[in-house]
Regions:
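Non-catalytic interaction-recognition regions
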Residues: 1-51, 58-512
Length: 512
C-alpha cells in the first residue's frame, strides 16, 4: 500500500508506511508490526491467532474455506470438453476435463452457483462421415474391396465398432441401401462413442449436470420454433441480420468483430457458427446470467464473433472464454505422440490407465491454462519427491499413518478393524477440547499460517478462474508438513504436545 501510494502522495514509501502503522488500531491477535525494506509492512500474528485455524479446520472439515455467493454473481453455465462424438477423447481433452471440473469445484467452494455442461457436437456432415467410415470398415471386414474416403475416420476404433455390428447383425447390411446403412451405422456409432465419453469422464470423476445435444437446437418446440429460429428472430429484431447474395449474415462487425459472419449459406445450408449462435441463445433462455466456455487455443479466432452475438441480444459481457494451451506428452524427456498399443494418438483413457486418475488430474492442473503443459508419463509414475503428485500424496499418507498409529495405541482393536474413517480415528486420538496453546514451534506456526491462507486463496482462484493455484498451494502445504514432521516429534512427545501436534497434523490432512 505504501509503495503504491508514494507517487500519488509525493512522500517516501517508508514515511507513508510509518503513518499507516501509527494509525493501526490495537488488536489482541497481533504480536508485532514492522516496516521492512522500501516500505513493506509486516504484521506478525500471535500463536493464539493461528491456533484457532486448527480448531476451525477440524470443526468445519470439508466446509473449511467456503465462501458465500459473491455480490452480482448468479447462475453460471460452465461448458467444457465438448469433444466430437466421432472418436476417443485424446490427452488434450484430459486437460479440459481437469480444468473444467476443478474450476467448477473451486467456484462452488467460493460460493458461486455453477452448472456444468458438455456440448455434444452431433450435427452436420461429420456425423455422416462417421457413419460412412463404419460402413466402409463393415464391408471390408466382410471381404468387400472398398476404399475409405478421404473425409472419413480411419482409426482402429472404427473397425471395433464395425466388428460389433457384425457380431450383432452379421452380413445383414452388406447389400442394403447405402444411405439406409450409413444412417443406421451413424446412429449406432454415435451411441457407442457417446457412451464412451460418459464412461471415461465418470471414471475421471467428472460429472456433468447436462449433456446438451447440438441436434436439439434444430428441433421445433411445441410452437413449431427451434432454438435456431428463436435466436435468428431475436437478432433480426435488434436489426443485426441482413441478406446479401442469397446468404443470411450477422452484422458482428458492429460489435468489434473484424468482419460480418454468414449464418445461412445461399444454398440454405446452416454454417457451424449458426449452431453456436443458437446454442448460446438457448443457454440464456434457460436462465443463466453468465457463460464460461473452456476452449482450445486454436479457437481464439471465434471469440470476437461469439462475444458479438451476446452483445447483439443485449447481454454484453455475459460470455467469458477460457483458452487452454496444448498438452505435450513425454516419456523420460522424449516426446511421445503415438500409443504403443494402437500406433495412433494417445487417448485420454490410455493416459489414465498408465498413470492413474489422481496423477493425471494434478499434473493437468500444474500450470495456468494459458501455458502449455509438458506431461512426462514416467515422472507421473515415480514414487519419489521428483513427482509432485507423489510428494503431496505422501504428506497425506504420512498424516494418516500417524493418526493410525496413535489410534492403535489408544484402541488397537478398533484401529485395526479397518471400519473407521480417518475422521473417526482422529476423534479417538485427539480430545474434543484439545489444548492448542503449546503449538509455538516455527514449523508449527508456518504450517498454521499456510492453512489460514486457504479460504482467501480459494476465493481468489475462483474469481480469477485459476484452479492451478490449488496445486501450487498443495505442494507448499505438503512441504511445510514434511518440515514440521522432521522438526517436531508428533507422537511420543511430552504431555503438553501429545494431543496438540496430532490435531495440527489432522488439520493439515483435511486441508490437503
Amino acid at each position: 500500500v505504501a509503495l503504491r501510494s508514494a507517487k500519488l502522495a509525493k512522500k517516501n514509501p517508508r514515511e507513508i508506511a510509518q503513518i499507516i502503522v501509527d494509525h493501526l488500531p490495537e488488536n489482541d491477535l497481533v504480536q508485532s508490526v514492522e516496516i521492512a525494506g522500501p516500505g513493506f509492512i509486516n504484521i506478525r500474528l500471535k500463536p493464539t491467532a493461528l491456533q484457532s485455524v486448527v480448531a476451525a479446520v477440524r470443526a468445519e472439515k470439508g466446509d473449511f474455506g467456503k465462501g458465500e455467493i459473491p455480490e452480482g454473481e448468479r447462475k453460471i453455465n460452465l461448458e467444457y470438453i465438448s469433444a466430437n462424438p466421432t472418436g476417443p477423447m485424446h490427452a488434450g481433452h484430459g486437460r479440459w476435463a481437469a480444468l473444467g471440473d476443478a474450476t467448477a469445484r473451486v467456484m462452488r467452494h467460493a460460493g458461486y452457483d455453477v452448472y456444468e455442461e458438455f456440448y455434444i457436437n452431433d450435427h452436420g456432415t461429420q456425423m455422416d462421415n462417421f457413419g460412412e467410415s463404419v460402413a466402409v470398415r463393415y464391408q471390408q471386414l466382410l471381404g468387400r474391396d472398398v476404399e475409405m474416403p478421404e473425409a472419413c475416420y480411419a482409426g482402429a476404433y472404427v473397425k471395433d465398432i464395425a466388428q460389433a455390428i457384425i457380431d450383432e447383425d452379421g452380413d445383414k447390411w452388406l447389400d442394403a441401401d447405402p444411405t439406409e446403412r450409413m444412417e443406421n451405422f451413424r446412429e449406432r456409432a454415435y451411441a457407442y462413442e457417446l457412451a464412451e465419453q460418459h464412461r471415461v469422464t465418470e471414471r475421471f470423476g467428472t460429472t456433468f449436470d447436462c449433456w446438451f445435444s447440438e441436434r436439439s437446437l434444430y428441433e421445433p418446440d411445441e410452437n413449431g420454433e427451434s432454438a435456431v429460429d428463436r435466436s435468428l428472430a431475436a437478432m433480426d429484431e435488434k436489426g443485426y441480420i441482413y441478406v446479401e447474395d442469397g446468404a443470411t449474415w450477422f452484422k458482428s462487425s458492429a460489435f468489434g468483430d473484424e468482419k460480418d459472419r454468414v449464418l445461412i449459406k445461399a444454398n440454405g445450408e446452416m454454417t457451424y457458427f449458426m449452431s453456436d449462435v443458437a446454442y448460446h441463445y438457448n443457454k440464456m433462455e434457460r436462465g443463466f446470467d453468465h457463460l464460461i466456455n473452456i476452449w482450445g487455443a486454436d479457437h481464439h479466432g471465434y471469440i470476437a464473433r461469439c462475444e458479438a452475438m451476446l452483445a447483439a441480444w443485449g447481454w454484453p459481457g455475459a460470455l467469458e472464454i477460457m483458452l487452454g494451451q496444448l498438452v505435450n506428452l513425454f516419456r523420460d524427456g522424449e516426446a511421445v505422440r503415438m500409443s504403443k498399443r494402437t500406433g495412433e494418438m494417445i487417448t485420454f483413457e490410455e493416459l489414465i490407465d498408465e498413470v492413474g486418475v489422481d496423477a493425471t488430474r494434478y499434473l493437468m492442473l500444474a500450470k495456468s491454462s494459458d501455458q502449455p503443459i509438458d506431461f512426462d508419463i514416467e515422472v507421473a509414475k515415480k514414487k519419489d519427491a521428483s513427482n509432485p503428485v507423489y510428494y503431496v500424496q505422501y504428506a497425506h499418507a504420512r498424516i494418516c499413518s500417524i493418526l493410525g498409529k496413535a489410534a492403535s495405541e489408544a484402541d488397537a482393536a478398533a484401529a485395526e478393524s479397518g471400519e473407521l474413517s480417518m475422521d473417526e480415528l482422529a476423534a479417538k486420538v485427539i480430545p474434543a477440547d484439545v489444548d492448542l496453546a503449546p503449538l509455538a514451534h516455527e514449523s508449527e506456526l508456518a504450517l498454521m499460517r499456510k492453512m489460514d491462507d486457504f479460504g482467501p486463496l480459494v476465493a481468489q482462484a475462483a474469481r480469477d478462474r485459476a484452479a492451478f493455484r490449488l496445486t501450487h498451494y498443495a505442494q507448499d502445504l505438503a512441504a511445510l508438513f514434511h518440515s514440521f514432521y522432521t522438526n517436531c516429534h508428533v507422537i511420543g512427545e511430552e504431555a503438553a504436545l501429545r494431543d496438540a501436534r496430532p490435531a495440527l497434523g489432522d488439520a493439515a490432512r483435511i486441508v490437503l
